[in-house]
Amino acid sequence: MERTKWGGRKAEKMKVIFLDIDGVLNDKYCRARAPSGCKGAVDAKLKLLREIVRKTDARLVLISSWKKYWKREETTDPDMLYLMRKLKRFGLSIYDKTEESFWAKRGEGIHAWLSANEDVMAWVVLDDETFPDYEKYGIDKHLVKTKFFYEKDAGLQEEHAEQAIAILNSCETEIANGN
């Protein structure tokens, strides 16, 4: 581990998955329900997410509306506790969340998070929606777009996992090639 000139640990480069929940971790056949009655997370989708994390060593950053209930210290919201337990069953956990002024400015939140965390070497967005500011911030190039949970083949699919892995691991190819 490298040290800063002050003796602290230097931040390691990391990979990040900006994760939406609805339309990514569930589909119309989802029987799992959060305590509020909202659609829960499908095990098959969580297995694919786990595969992405295992093959890339990426961290999960929530961009979903679910994030309003997540706290780094202690979460008491029943829906968030449900999600955290489901993730934990698959060896996954939430690293952080984005903050934006309005739900339609999801790209702004991602951009702000990346600006505040300069140790990110690669990132991908798993989302079933494209927000107006995605193009403005260059997020569309990192977007792996799933289908909304009422559409056919909704949520995270094998091809999405492969695409996300390729995006996250492309930085290793660039580093190996001296770029």
What does each model-identified segment do?
Residues 53-79:
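Substrate-recognition element of Asp-dependent hydrolases with the DxDx(T/V) motif
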Residues 26-28, 69-73, 132-136, 153:
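Short catalytic/ligand-binding loop motif for oxyanion handling, primarily in non-cytosolic enzymes
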Residues 12-57:
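Active-site neighborhood of HAD-like aspartate-dependent phosphohydrolases
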Residues 81-179:
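C-terminal cap/substrate-recognition subdomain and adjoining C-terminal extension
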Residues 39-42, 69-73, 101-104:
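Acidic-and-aromatic substrate-binding clefts and catalytic sites of carbohydrate-active enzymes
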Residues 16, 59, 122-124:
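Structural motif
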